[in-house]
Design a protein with these regions (language model features):
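Generic structural signal for well-ordered alpha-helices
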Residues: 59-64, 104-107
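Substrate-gating cap/lid alpha-helix
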Residues: 83-121, 146, 165
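Histidine-centered active-site loop/cap adjacent to the catalytic His
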Residues: 134-165
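Serine-esterase "nucleophile elbow" of acetyl-processing enzymes
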Residues: 1-20, 28-35
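Acidic-and-aromatic substrate-binding clefts and catalytic sites of carbohydrate-active enzymes
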Residues: 21-27, 49-56
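The substrate-binding groove and active-site-proximal loops of carbohydrate-active enzymes
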Residues: 45-54, 90-98, 134-142
C-alpha cells in the first residue's frame, strides 16, 4: 500500500490521490484541477518523472497557482524518494542529481516565499542500501515502510499545526 494511503489510515484523515501514473509533471492543467478542489491541505509528489528543465520551467507557476487558490491551506511538496546517486547507471545518476539540485533550489526559495508551502527535503528517505526498490526507481514494501517513517511524522506535524488531526 502506498505511503500516503497508509498515513491516511494512521492519522484518520482522508487523502484523495490524483495519481497520473508518474506522468503528472506540474502541467498547468494539473494545477487547475488541484486549484478547483475543496481541500484542507495538498501533498504533492510531482517530481518523480520530471526533468531538471521541466522543474525549472514549471514549478514556480504551479506553486503560485496552488497558493492563489488555497492561500490558507498547507501545500506540502516531497522530492523523489529514491536516491539514484547510488545507482550503477551513471547517466541516470547524473540526471537525477541535476534534477535534485534544481528541485532543492527552487522549492527552498518557494517555501521561503509562501508561508503555507513546505518542502520536505529528506535525504535517503528510502535508505542507501538499494534494498528499498525493485529497480532503483520504484519503491517496494520496504521502501514504502521507510518513506512512511521518514515523511509521516513531518506531514502529521504540519497538518496538526493547522488543526488537521
Amino acid at each position: 500500500m502506498a505511503p500516503l494511503a497508509r498515513l491516511s489510515r494512521q492519522l484518520g484523515v482522508d487523502f484523495v490521490n490524483f495519481s497520473y501514473s508518474g506522468q503528472g509533471k506540474m502541467e498547468p492543467e494539473s494545477a487547475e484541477v488541484l486549484a478547483d478542489c475543496e481541500t484542507d491541505a495538498i501533498i504533492c509528489y510531482c517530481f518523480g518523472n520530471t526533468t531538471a528543465q521541466q522543474v525549472e520551467e514549471r514549478v514556480d507557476a504551479f506553486v503560485e497557482r496552488l497558493v492563489k487558490s488555497h492561500p490558507d491551506k498547507d501545500i506540502i511538496f516531497m522530492p523523489p524518494y529514491l536516491n539514484c546517486e547510488y545507482s550503477l547507471n551513471l547517466v541516470k545518476r547524473e540526471s537525477v542529481l541535476e534534477k535534485r539540485a534544481v528541485i532543492t533550489r527552487k522549492m527552498t526559495a518557494l517555501a521561503k516565499k509562501y508561508k503555507n508551502v513546505y518542502f520536505l527535503n529528506i535525504k535517503d528517505a528510502c535508505g542507501t542500501d538499494l534494498e528499498a526498490s525493485i529497480d532503483n526507481s520504484h519503491p517496494n514494501d520496504l521502501g514504502f515502510d521507510r518513506i512512511l517513517k521518514s515523511y509521516g511524522p513531518k506531514i502529521a506535524k504540519i497538518l496538526k499545526k493547522h488543526g488537521i488531526k
